[in-house]
């Protein structure tokens, strides 16, 4: 029995919720193969068995180790879907069928079929040390090369001069951007480029106004020191108050300027599974409610 799984609360590139079963002679252009992709970004488990009768079985779904759900009488629970496809002409055809299905039936809205922009991101060039002048210099060089979009990365908000503080305080840092976000966006657009911006909404720094005001919003087990990753904790996204706060702050930023693109980052996995919103016998619902 082969297994691919994640109990980190996320899927990601580390453990991807997909699998391919293929014949030994399968190549990119020849051979038979089955593919399955779990449409879910939380903890998952894929098990594949090949038994003594030469029968293959695949099971793919929510990871059972962290999952519990109290189902009331007459209530329902909708499990996430799995995309399943087959190719008798190799892995390339299998990939194309997945891509076509996702593009035509999973992607939605006006962005479904538009051409994706070529973009430049300031992160590796500046890290947290930037101002409007530095960002515009990058944009000017990128525009000269024909780049379509500039994405402003981490550090534009709160007191965010390193990765130890400021996460959760989604207010423009006007010491770095003197004219505010709107002025910078206008200048970038004047170069013929679009503008994108970075968020990491799930996260909170202990050194932030948000955490000082609402420490109870962070996922942590009472009476224990929390596990930190990249010097940050996670917000309890199953909490409606947290959802409302993030929706309001992110909406205000996106409505404050002509922003075309969001880079939604997530730089750590989830641990310390506990929420004050559920009793002890229902804590296993948090991983799915979080997603």
PLM-predicted stretches and their roles:
Residues 111-127:
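Glycine- and charge-enriched low-complexity intrinsically disordered segments
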Residues 114-115, 145-154, 259-266, 270-271:
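Short coil-to-beta-strand
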Residues 54, 71, 78-83, 122-123, ...:
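Catalytic cores of glycan-processing enzymes that make or break glycosidic bonds
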Residues 173-190, 211-291:
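Active-site neighborhood of glycoside hydrolase catalytic domains
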Residues 126-212, 244-248, 289-291:
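Aromatic- and glycine-enriched glycan-recognition loops and surfaces
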Residues 18, 22-44, 86-110, 118, ...:
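Glycine-rich, aromatic-flanked loop segments that form ligand/cofactor-binding clefts
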């Amino acid at each position: 029995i082969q297994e691919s799984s994640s109990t980190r609360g996320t899927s990601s590139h580390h453990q991807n919720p997909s699998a391919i079963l293929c014949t030994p002679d399968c190549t990119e252009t020849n051979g038979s193969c089955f593919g399955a992709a779990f449409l879910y970004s939380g903890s998952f488990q894929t098990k594949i068995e090949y038994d003594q009768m030469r029968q293959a079985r695949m099971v793919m779904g929510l990871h059972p180790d962290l999952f519990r759900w109290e189902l009331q009488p007459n209530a329902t629970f909708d499990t996430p879907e799995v995309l399943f496809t087959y190719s008798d002409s190799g892995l390339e055809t299998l990939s194309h069928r997945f891509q076509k299905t996702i593009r035509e039936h999973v992607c939605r809205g006006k962005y479904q079929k538009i051409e994706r922009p070529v973009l430049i991101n300031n992160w590796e060039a500046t890290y947290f040390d930037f101002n409007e002048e530095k960002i515009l210099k990058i944009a000017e060089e990128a525009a000269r090369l024909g780049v379509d979009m500039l994405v402003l990365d981490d550090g534009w908000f709160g007191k965010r001069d390193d990765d130890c503080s400021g996460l959760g305080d989604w207010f423009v840092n006007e010491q770095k951007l003197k004219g505010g976000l709107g002025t910078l966006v206008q200048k970038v657009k004047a170069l013929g480029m679009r503008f994108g911006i970075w968020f990491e909404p799930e996260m909170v720094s202990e050194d932030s106004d948000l955490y000082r005001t609402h420490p109870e919003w962070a996922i942590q087990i009472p009476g224990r020191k929390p596990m930190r990753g990249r010097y940050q904790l996670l917000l309890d996204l199953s909490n409606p108050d947290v959802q409302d706060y993030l929706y309001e702050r992110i909406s205000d930023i996106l409505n404050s300027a002509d922003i075309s693109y969001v880079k939604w980052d997530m730089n750590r996995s989830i641990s310390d599974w506990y929420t004050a919103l559920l009793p002890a016998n229902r804590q296993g619902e948090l991983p799915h409610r979080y997603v």
